[in-house]
Amino acid sequence: MKFEEQARAYRETIERYLASIYASFGEEPQKPIFEAANYSLLAGGKRLRPMLALEFCRICGRNPEEALPFAAAVEMIHTYSLIHDDLPCMDNDDYRRGRLTNHKVFGEGMAVLAGDALLTDAFAVAARAKLPEPGKIGEAIAILSECAGSLGMIGGQVLDIMSAQRACTEQEVLDIQSRKTGRLIVAPCVLGVIAGNGTEAQKEGAAGFASLLGLAFQIRDDILDVIGDAGELGKATGVDGDKNTFVRLYGLSSCEQLVKDYTARAIDCLKVFPDPSFLTELALSLTERKN
């Protein structure tokens, strides 16, 4: 199957699974929170993170759908982080993926709760995964928590806020973005290997690939904030001008080369897998993305 066909098939599988999560909760009194959560969860997007989980599971020799609970959990956590990022007390954004942000539609209080629900429910979804070795559920949950929590994505957000009023060093920017963006790309890759009953060497390869891909992804985001089209991005551009971004640190031309360098290094980490062609094409496609 060609790359685009496989990517489309993965997205369709992921969309169906995500749509089923809150639908299975029934007509509870808390239905408004399901609607608010679904508004953002089902808003589309690249579905990069869940796609990575499915492909790493497949490349380790298992049915990729066995990784769906992990894939969905990561996407739920990613979505909660976007809802909270958009709040007035954080980035104060009005648009996300071409439509009004969650708090603009449902109010700030409900948006906070929708994010909280997505984060909390994500762990229940992940815990339902049926692994070849059931004992590895605990390992998977621990990895997910660490990548999303104070040592991972949240930690990166904290460092970002703390450094907002000063210029950061190269190492500080790398540390912020490795946590803030990179760790939630590491999670689905490693969880996909766990779902696929992969080896320790494959877990390490997946983590290395994801860490480097995460940096390339963030640098491309920083580039698009400067040169991207707001219509294509589905959100405002130029909002990171005062932040400690890679573009501010290195300049546009150097960042374009850095994206290529980090992507090449990420692809090199895939040598422990039998057929990394899909992951290679996926990584390369991200270097030229417009949104």
Residue spans of the language-model regions?
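All-alpha prenyltransferase/terpene-synthase fold signal
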Residues: M1-N291
